[in-house]
Amino acid sequence: MPKSRVENLCAILISKNSSVEEQVKKISNSDPEQKIIIPFTYDEIHKNLNSELYDSRFRKVFYSRDLFAFKSPLKKDSYFFGRNNLVNELVSKHNSSEHAGVFGLRKSGKTSIIYAIQRKLNIEKKSCVMLDCESPAIHQKRWYELLKEVVQEYKSLKISNVRIDLDSRYDEKNAAKSFEEDILKIYNSKKKETTLFIFDEIERISPFTGSSQHWSNGTDFIYFWQTLRSFYQKHPSVYTYMLVGTNPKCIEQPQFFGQDNPIYLSCSIHYLPNFSANQVIEMVGTLGRLMGLNFGTDICALLHNDCGGHPFLIRQMCSFIHNTYKNERPFTVDKATYRTALADYKSNLQQYFDMMLNVLSSWYPDEYEMLIMLALEDIETFNEFAKDNPSMVDHLLSFGLIQKSYNHKYVLSLDSLEIYLKNKNKFKKITLSDEEKLEEISLRRNRLEKKLRNLILNGLRFAYGKKAQEELLKAIPEDRREKLRSSSINDLLSNNTQLF
């Protein structure tokens, strides 16, 4: 569809094909990002002069689609909101021969940003290579093998016919020199333009977080980036690189394993900000309107506050409302409806927070611990940490997980996140009251008892097989055995057992 269209999210299609409605439905089902198409046949148009057919068809198409339920990265512009300024800035950095880093939590939209950058570069007739470092095909390669991979990807992108010997020249001693020679050959063989190399999931090939030992605990990171950095310093017009990940530690730390970090402070760092109130209104209002849902500015403000401006959480909340009130369209979401939906939706939040914070807790436990300190109101310890580690506070602020209040105190950005962390770390607080200590002891005892029962059950079955129940009964006073004999061994060791 032409870019000059007034309405870019939907279109009317009139066809001679009598099964056009079914064909359009198949296309929409196969591509969730497909624009909304309202199909009619010529016969329908000629035979129906009243508006009933059109009203019915529009309702059927619009109200059946859940435009909020995108869980995969967005590959098209149709439903891409709130990030265009960042995309333009990153492309501008590349056009100025500057490197960049894009960082954010899981489900914050990093991969959608990459796709948007690729689309914009395509429009500008510029080239881009994307390497997914999460793939074993990337992170299992040694540094010199990955250099070879970059050359192959670059040659393929440029559709260059230049002859390059890739078989024998990419070992530890010769890879850096071969890389420079081959990249220059390819660059000079076609139209000369600066290519953007994007390294997605950069943590997978970084020290301490790498998915393979040679990246995590070896010097492959050092040698790989020494090569790319050295080439760039000699030939700044050939390529720039953009690193995409969760945490910019690979750029911020000056040394790794006693050696200088080749890309230390070499990239401008960009965090994916949470949506502003106006961006929430734009996204929710636009998509809701197409689905027959009216979200007023007051409801958008509540969504912004309750979800902390996180676009993924906002979309999932709106999707939940859509599915809850699916049979009522058009439908205005008022405060009472919203509050009811939010209360029901909160049970889904734990899995989303688990997913979003998993990388933080696994790879950057200090930042995660600081979140827990705030949730448990252990402000004194948090402030001590913050004083000694200001970069960690900056990361949490940039992720949109914490805010600095007017009196310079730090608080969690989402009430729901605070509740989640409190429940998950209920007894991690150091200064427990006597009542909290007793509750903690009771909970731990109950958990331990359940584990011991399972251990005993498995041990008896392993040792005695079908005779396990009989062996268990032998340990019980004779006057109680007959009463318990009718119970299975599972029942005897269950939570509701009559054994105790």
Tell me what each language-model feature is.
Residues S4-Y63:
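Charged, structured surface patches that assemble and position nucleic-acid processing machinery
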Residues A100-D132:
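P-loop NTPase Walker A phosphate-binding motif
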Residues C128, Q140-D165:
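Conserved NTP-binding/hydrolysis module of P-loop NTPases
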Residues E193, H214-D306, F320-T324, E328-N348:
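The catalytic "switch" region of P-loop NTPases
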